[in-house]
Amino acid sequence: MYDIRQWRHVFKLDPNKGISDEQLERICESGTDAVIVGGTDDVTLENVLELLARIRRFSVPCVLEISNLESVTPGFDFYFVPMVLNSREKKWIIDLHHEAVKQFGDIMNWDEIFMEGYCILHKNCKAAMLTDANTELQEDDVVAYARIAEHMYRLPIFYLEYSGSYGNPELVQRVKQVLKQTQLFYGGGIETEKQAKEMAQYADTIVVGNVIYEDIKKALATVKAVKQ
């Protein structure tokens, strides 16, 4: 399924974490709509290429979520580019993107590139610390970022990132209510069928990541929970 607007469930794999061939096959053949390759630390060209080659044995759409320029490589179906809207550092909002386009603009296929307006809400996660994200936000702040993503920046994706911590379903619902065109992704702390189903009521697309490495059976069960 190569229309990202139809995606309801995606798995996110960290190239810096090990996964067996058997587990990877179960993930790729699970019925998930796509597999995103991405992480916060120690993402290298070498480990991205290795994981890409293994995923490419299967037909599932494969996305690289770009965390640094050094690990970008051809071969993915799509490239997701985070813009951390609640970062205190300008480089996570525009500077890194400017550098990427400066270096590679002539060869970039813009049809494969999707900008993500990130709002990171778990203050102790690696992504928040790396990007110096202001996570002390009221609900109205988050809703405002969502509106900025859709109406000011015209971003195709708004990503609520709780990164390892299960978020507030009521907030996800509020955000969804104000988005008409921008696709709402939710990621963070989904470990059970119940949690997957709950967040899928409101988010257009849920992202399941950490539980893959903790309990593969629980991870796989989230696909059915969302697709039913």
Curated annotation (Swiss-Prot):
Which Gene Ontology terms describe the biological processes this protein takes part in?
glycerophospholipid biosynthetic process
Q: Name one GO molecular function term.
A: magnesium ion binding
Query: Which InterPro entries does the UniProt entry name for this protein?
Result: GGGP/HepGP_synthase_I, GGGP/HepGP_synthase_sf, GGGP_HepGP_synthase
Keywords for this protein: Lipid biosynthesis, Lipid metabolism, Magnesium, Metal-binding, Phospholipid biosynthesis, Phospholipid metabolism, Transferase
Needed co-factor(s): Mg(2+)
Quick one: which residues bind sn-glycerol 1-phosphate?
K12, Y159, L160, E161, Y162, S163, G164, G189, G209, N210
Reported EC number(s) for this entry are 2.5.1.n9
Q: Name one Pfam family in it.
A: PcrB
Q: Known catalysed reaction(s)?
A: sn-glycerol 1-phosphate + all-trans-heptaprenyl diphosphate = 3-heptaprenyl-sn-glycero-1-phosphate + diphosphate
Source organism, top-level taxon: Bacteria
Task: Explain the purpose of this protein.
Answer: Prenyltransferase that catalyzes in vivo the transfer of the heptaprenyl moiety of heptaprenyl pyrophosphate (HepPP; 35 carbon atoms) to the C3 hydroxyl of sn-glycerol-1-phosphate (G1P), producing heptaprenylglyceryl phosphate (HepGP). This reaction is an ether-bond-formation step in the biosynthesis of archaea-type G1P-based membrane lipids found in Bacillales.
Per the record, the similarity remark reads: Belongs to the GGGP/HepGP synthase family. Group I subfamily.
Q: What is this protein called?
A: Heptaprenylglyceryl phosphate synthase
Q: Give the species.
A: Geobacillus sp. (strain WCH70)
